[in-house]
Swiss-Prot record:
Gene Ontology CC annotation, any one: membrane
InterPro entries linked: CaCA_antiporter, NaCa_Exmemb, NCX_ion-bd_dom_sf
Chief place of localization: membrane
Protein name: Putative sodium/calcium exchanger 6
Top-level taxon of the source organism: Eukaryota
Cystine pairs: none
Secretion signal span: 1-19
Similarity field: Belongs to the Ca(2+):cation antiporter (CaCA) (TC 2.A.19) family.
GO biological process per UniProt: intracellular calcium ion homeostasis; monoatomic cation transport
Bilayer topology term: Multi-pass membrane protein
This protein's UniProt keywords: Antiport, Calcium, Calcium transport, Ion transport, Membrane, Signal, Sodium, Sodium transport, Transmembrane, Transmembrane helix, Transport
MF terms in GO: calcium:sodium antiporter activity
Subcellular localization(s) per the UniProt record: Membrane
Length: 590
């Protein structure tokens, strides 16, 4: 139990660091720009409005380029490749068009990569953790997946609030509302469409009820106050504390009920003739729902990789080849269609990098591979969250040095305290947590690059900030939620995906509003809270989507069918119809 507790704390703390990815990356790039720009260039800089990338209609290409260079903290999405700068500073219109097309193709490849990372590495790690801790799907959804999916939004809100001398609650909440509406409608709709399932009654009602209470409390604050009082964010933190206690209590009661059921031994006979007649048997392997032929392939692959007996150059090379090969087997290749073969070819290099940097709990023990991953993963994790060059203390080396020290310590521990041909105790359990952490890091690294491309498309198209925030930015910020939730749903955990979709956004709202504004009020900052018609519609349709899901669950006797997903999509489309009417002043909400 002690191992479970410390492993859980380590994962929560490190996954939380992933949330700083976009904002820390922006701050680091902005600081580097200020160091490299000389006095003459500073005069060329066109200041921004402090909130968004605002390009005026009358600017020429040189002014736009200088503005983007000086304000890449707002004009870029937080990744390493600065697409907005490349496009806006292109030497000719032809180069500009080529860069835009290249960016779109790059984004499509990134979608293939993030899908592979989620399906082949993130989901197996989640499955192993659920089996190891023996927790229900709903608890796993509102803990591991909620923290993993929600960390960027929460820490992004903290960074934006603390970096501003006069933070605005409506701007921070607008981002949380936009992501919340998209996830509770579109992401949940795709999850249900992927795998219709019977919802967990108590946990679903609990999550929706807490979410509606939080929205009602915010509506009360917006109606009667135009600024944030310190008791408001503290109340949100208190609500989240009550929510956590409710989750823990429900898990305790669930475990007791499960033990009572296990006391009753029921022996069920199986008709062997029916099994022989079944063309395609479904089995559970490592908590993944697999076809019989898939299990035979997996077992054949595992049996083909024999543990290394002695240290030899040829043996180590062969071990690397068997564990890190990024291409499918000949049997799998023959069964693929043309589209799948193209995807497999495009995914060859990414798959090799994934296997090199993400420990996999379903792979057999390999000491050389484990040594290599211990050496690479800590520093690569810092690279993913863009903090390698950050110095934690004055006059201290960057975090990359501390990561390198950790790599050496882990490598030495594996080298001296494990055997070559024998898997150490607790290896599968520990490797599941490490795989979860590294797959989350990869998903956020890829998602940040997608956000960069999407932000570039938004800046180039010159759409309004409200439309950009409600569409492109909301969608791009929720890519990780969409990929992770759909992935675990396909692997046989749709209830976990639903719990993550609703519970994760509840976590974002309660902590994303409660924590940063509590800190800001303690610092003595004045925080305005004036809601505009767009945010009112956001809150209204977010409440409508939650109430509809609650009522539809009872109407369908808790089995969520595809008609439910169609209805959620209709709600989301209706929201944009009302937004369009509001922006055109056809619908006026004073």
């Amino acid at each position: 139990m002690r191992i479970h507790f410390f492993a859980f704390l380590i994962i929560l703390s490190l996954v939380g660091c992933d949330g700083w990815q976009a904002d820390v990356g922006k701050l680091v790039r902005k600081w580097n720009n200020q160091r490299t720009i000389d006095g003459n260039d500073i005069e060329k800089c066109i200041p921004d409005d402090g909130e968004q990338c605002t390009i005026q209609a009358g600017w020429n290409s040189t002014q736009v380029c200088e503005y983007v260079k000086c304000n890449d903290d707002n004009c870029e999405g937080g990744g390493y490749v600065l697409w907005t700068r490349y496009v806006e500073c292109a030497s000719s219109p032809a180069v500009r068009i080529i860069l835009i097309i290249t960016g779109v193709i790059y984004m499509l490849v990134l979608f293939i990569m993030v899908s592979s990372a989620a399906d082949d590495f993130f989901s197996p790690s989640i499955s192993s953790i659920v089996a190891h801790l023996r927790i229900s799907e709903s608890v796993a959804g509102v803990t591991f997946m909620a923290f993993g999916n929600g960390a960027p939004d929460v820490f992004g809100a903290i960074a934006s609030v603390l970096s501003s001398p006069t933070p605005k609650a409506d701007l921070a909440l607008g981002e949380l509302f936009g992501a919340g509406l998209f996830v509770t409608t579109m992401v949940l709709a795709v999850t249900i469409f992927t795998r219709p399932f019977k919802a967990e009654v108590f946990s679903s009602i609990r999550d929706i009820a807490f979410y509606l209470v939080a929205l009602a409390f915010l509506a009360f604050c917006f109606v009667y106050y135009d600024h944030v009082e310190i008791w408001m964010p503290i109340t949100f933190l208190g609500v989240y504390l009550i929510y956590v206690c409710t989750v823990i209590l429900s898990q305790i009661l669930h475990n007791r009920h499960k033990k009572d059921e296990e006391k009753v031994d029921e022996v069920k006979t199986v008709d062997t003739d029916s099994l022989e007649d079944d063309d395609d048997i479904y089995v559970s392997h490592g908590h993944h729902v697999l076809h019989a032929h898939e299990v035979m392939k997996m077992e054949a692959e595992i049996e083909a990789v024999e543990p290394l007996k002695t240290w030899s150059f040829r043996g180590v090379v062969h071990d690397f080849k068997e564990h890190l090969k990024p291409w499918p087997s000949m049997d799998e290749w023959d069964e693929m269609n043309i589209f799948q073969k193209v995807i497999a070819v495009l995914n060859t290099i990414p798959n090799f990098l994934f296997k090199l940097t993400i420990p996999h709990s379903e792979q057999p023990w390999s000491k050389p591979i484990t040594l290599l991953q211990c050496l690479i993963c800590p520093v690569f994790l810092l690279f993913c969250i863009q903090v390698c060059s950050i110095s934690p203390f004055p006059n201290s080396p960057g975090l990359w040095m501390y990561g390198l020290i950790l790599s050496v310590l882990l490598t030495a521990a594996v080298l001296f305290f494990t055997e070559l041909h024998k898997e150490p105790p607790f290896y599968k359990s520990l490797i599941s947590y490490a795989g979860f952490l590294m797959s989350i890091a990869w998903i956020y690294l890829i998602s940040s690059e997608v956000v960069n491309v999407v932000t570039m498309l938004g800046v180039v198209s010159r759409v309004s900030h409200e439309v950009l925030g409600l569409t492109i930015l909301a969608w791009s910020n929720s890519i990780g939620d969409l990929i992770a939730d759909v992935s675990v749903a396909k692997q046989g955990y749709p209830r976990m995906a639903m719990a993550a979709a609703i519970g994760g956004q509840l976590f974002n709202l309660l902590i994303g509003f409660g924590l940063p504004f509590t800190i800001a009020k303690i610092q003595g900052k004045s925080i305005s809270m004036i809601i505009n018609p767009t945010y009112r519609l956001l809150m209204l349709f977010l409440a409508i989507s939650l109430i509809f899901t609650l009522i539809a669950m009872f109407a369908q006797k808790y089995f969520l069918r595809r008609i439910h997903s169609y209805s959620l999509v209709f709600i989301y489309i209706s929201f944009f119809v009302f937004i369009g009417l509001s922006l055109d002043d056809i619908l006026v909400w004073n």
